[in-house]
Amino acid sequence: MKILVLNAGSSSHKCCLYAIEGPLPDHPAPPLWEAQLDWHDPNHASLKVKTKRENLEEDLSDVSRADALSHLLTTLWHGPTQVIQMAQEINVVGHRVVHGGQDYQSSVVVTSEVKTAIADLIPLAPNHNPANLEGIKLIEQLLGNVRQVAVFDTAFHSHLPEVAAIYPGPYDWQQQGIRRYGFHGISHQYCTQRTAEILGRGVDRLIICHLGNGASLTAVKQGQSIDTSMGFTPLEGLMMGTRSGSIDPGILIHLMRQGYDADQLDHMLNKASGLKGISGVSHDLREIEQAIAQDNAQAKLARDLYLHRLKACLGSMLMSLGGVDVLVFTGGIGEHSASVRAETCEALAFLGLKLDPILNRKSPVDQDIAAVDSKVRVLVIKTQEDWAIAQSCYEQCC
């Protein structure tokens, strides 16, 4: 079976192709082909394609989104990165869909009803669901009636306990769909499964730290999400690359009274806050650490604030679980920043958590970096959302 995975965003398309023969393997299979399309402005994009044998890089000018994606897909069966003979070899296409609302608690085959539901949820995910829906429609145009599967980022959190899901506003907010949904669910679910594989056992109490440009924590009890830091939107929770995370809602009322409108507040909180907003340097923690080395006080404040908020939110997840048996770090920062892991774990030393400093500095993938005598295991996991989407497609089709 050949499975194409499409992760369509507002400014990029990421795709990969998997070939699965026989039963699903126990470990993630490497893709046959990977491609990324990044938009620099509405008519200009850059394309990168990677296969085992060849790499391809191109600049695309004066092209529509549909034409650019069509060109990207043709590199599957044409040119130096060809890995299949024709488009008809693709059996199924899986899509990451950020918001599935209350109705979609697992992956589903895309139908007209599903497309309508994704469109109806655009007000809850205006930066993501439109691009996800566009990706589905483009595949329909380019690949005809190939089966498509929607894999929802909210699904893993769809069974949150009421006390974790309901906001303490008016009770009728629930009828409006205003509740905690949680995000990064594909990553959190993958890490939950991968943790059990690495340790060779199920885990009772697990906290997953997905730390990238977007960041979230999830408390997992016996394989089920019971609390998570992102909420009604991916804006809630931790301080992130450009997002503020949780702030006093009274600040927004204050700014509205000063004349700010919804679009200005949206941009401020989603694009001009977080590490970028505080440091004035970058959303990238690596660049912030370079600025700190040059005695940039604002950059140091941004990093200190990032870690303070991370530790505070970890405390919340810890209380929801009543302790922790395994702590997982994933995402770009989680996987690669030994210093963030070390400083975070130092705050949990009272639990008997001890890192192996040598292993931590090596940032090993899919390994336990806790000391032998640590009472809490600490794993670094390379999240593989694309593979998780491919797994969902396989399960829908077999």
Swiss-Prot record:
Record field: catalytic activity: acetate + ATP = acetyl phosphate + ADP
GO terms of molecular function: acetate kinase activity; ATP binding; magnesium ion binding
Main location: cytoplasm
Annotated pathway: Metabolic intermediate biosynthesis; acetyl-CoA biosynthesis; acetyl-CoA from acetate: step 1/2
Entry's Gene Ontology BP terms: acetate metabolic process; acetyl-CoA biosynthetic process
GO CC annotations on file: cytoplasm
Membership in a protein family: Belongs to the acetokinase family.
Function: Catalyzes the formation of acetyl phosphate from acetate and ATP. Can also catalyze the reverse reaction.
Protein name: Acetate kinase
